[in-house]
């Protein structure tokens, strides 16, 4: 990868993160005041503070310490349920210490996708009956990123609403709807839980790949945080849980015939492009057959177009009407067959692991340059870039750079 490529990706990440930062009149800290809020996109498509988007952009290391501390504080003070289960309308529940999907400017937490309502009516179950799994784990990853870049270990003992940050993180890590024997996240078919936010219009059941990978990464991060404050025994326990999850991910989701990982064991038992790439990026799997599957799909044009990544290989759609077995959106739109740059960095790392090539990143940069005046990088595009959405999208700008950083850190040609 040429130095100009790495530099261009960094510049794009900086610019996109800047485009996503808006000054809003908000009440996150007990009073209404003007404060900078990081939104998912530069066109304000989503008018709230999304926990996962912020955490994923933060992985770039490009958010200033003071800003990341503020966002972390917003989640700790406004975005986590208390000790009791909240029972909402239409059979929805918010488990103890669940973390919100997004937090409105008035400081009120919204635990379910598809709505800005923060009261008892947060949906009818079409976005799950428990909050998406992912935000508990992104809360932990956000905290770990802040401590890593700032060196501010003391924040872990700081009080946030009557609990230390460490206590809040540990309760988030325990999670809900977990198969305790395997450590994997599990969704009931009759009252399902959204896997994670970038497939919140997709219904899955059984054990879930992507949520379990996030749980693995969060436990590994929490182990390091425990070590940083001298809690080595507790750190070893969290690391052991991470190892258990990784072992069971490989046992449960890996398809030896193809090298792909399945997205779920029930509804949605399909090859998961994003999840497979993320498993490689997370160090959970490194099988040659898996790397070959990702390379073959890239070279064959079934998983990637212009550096953007599809959730399901295009030649593995569930039917002629839908990429996923169960989705609320039309084929080849949004999360049901469109192409996204959120997974580009993970995929780039996997391709580099296979044959030391990084063409996917240069493809992405070329497309971004061609459509920059139209709002690139986009949230998603179709194959022809005729249908698209989400302008100057935060994770589309930041995560390709994160993949490039990983390649460089492991000795990739820069």
Which residues are covered by each model-predicted region?
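The substrate-binding groove and active-site-proximal loops of carbohydrate-active enzymes
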Residues: 52, 122-130, 153-163
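Well-ordered alpha-helical scaffold segments within catalytic/enzyme domains
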Residues: 55-67, 138-157, 214-231, 277-289, ...
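Solenoid-repeat scaffolds in large eukaryotic assemblies
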Residues: 68-71, 235, 242, 290, ...
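Structural signature of alpha-solenoid helical repeat junctions
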Residues: 131, 135-138, 142, 211-214, ...
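An active-site-proximal structural segment forming one wall of the substrate-binding cleft
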Residues: 165-176
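C-terminal substrate/ligand-recognition segments
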Residues: 329-357
């Amino acid at each position: 990868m040429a130095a100009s490529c790495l530099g261009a990706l960094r510049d794009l990440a900086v610019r996109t993160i800047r485009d996503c930062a808006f000054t809003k009149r908000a009440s996150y800290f007990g009073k209404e005041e003007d404060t900078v809020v990081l939104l998912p996109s530069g066109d304000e498509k989503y008018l709230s503070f999304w926990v996962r988007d912020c955490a994923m952009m933060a992985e770039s290391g490009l958010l200033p310490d003071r800003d990341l501390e503020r966002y972390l504080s917003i989640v700790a003070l406004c975005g986590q349920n208390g000790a009791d289960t909240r029972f909402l309308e239409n059979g929805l529940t918010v488990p103890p210490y669940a973390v919100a999907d997004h937090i409105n400017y008035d400081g009120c937490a919204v635990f379910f996708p598809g709505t800005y309502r923060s009261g008892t009516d947060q949906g009818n179950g079409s976005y799950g009956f428990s909050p998406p799994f992912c935000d508990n784990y992104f809360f932990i990853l956000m905290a770990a990123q802040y401590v890593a870049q700032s060196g501010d270990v003391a924040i872990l003992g700081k009080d946030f609403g009557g609990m230390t940050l460490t206590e809040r993180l540990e309760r988030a890590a325990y999670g809900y709807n977990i198969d305790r024997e395997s450590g994997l996240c599990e969704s009931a078919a009759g009252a399902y839980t959204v896997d994670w936010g970038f497939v919140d219009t997709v219904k899955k059941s059984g054990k879930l790949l992507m949520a379990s990978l996030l749980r693995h990464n969060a436990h590994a991060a929490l182990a390091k945080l425990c070590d940083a404050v001298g809690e080595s025994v507790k750190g070893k326990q969290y690391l052991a849980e991470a190892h258990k999850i990784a072992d069971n991910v490989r046992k449960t989701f890996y398809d030896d015939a193809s090298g792909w990982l399945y997205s779920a064991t029930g509804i949605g038992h399909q090859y998961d492009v994003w999840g497979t790439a993320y498993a490689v990026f997370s160090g959970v799997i490194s099988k040659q057959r898996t790397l070959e599957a990702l390379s073959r799909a890239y070279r064959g044009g079934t998983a990637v177009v212009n550096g953007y990544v599809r959730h399901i290989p295009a030649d593995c759609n569930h039917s002629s009407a839908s990429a996923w077995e169960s989705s609320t959106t039309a084929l080849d739109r949004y999360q049901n067959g469109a192409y996204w740059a959120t997974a580009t960095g993970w995929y780039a790392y996997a391709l580099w692991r296979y044959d030391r090539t990084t063409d996917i990143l240069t493809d992405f940069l070329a497309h971004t340059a061609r459509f920059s005046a139209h709002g690139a990088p986009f949230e998603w595009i179709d194959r022809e870039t005729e249908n698209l959405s989400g302008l100057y999208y935060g994770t589309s700008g930041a995560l390709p750079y994160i993949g490039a950083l990983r390649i460089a850190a492991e000795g990739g040609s820069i």
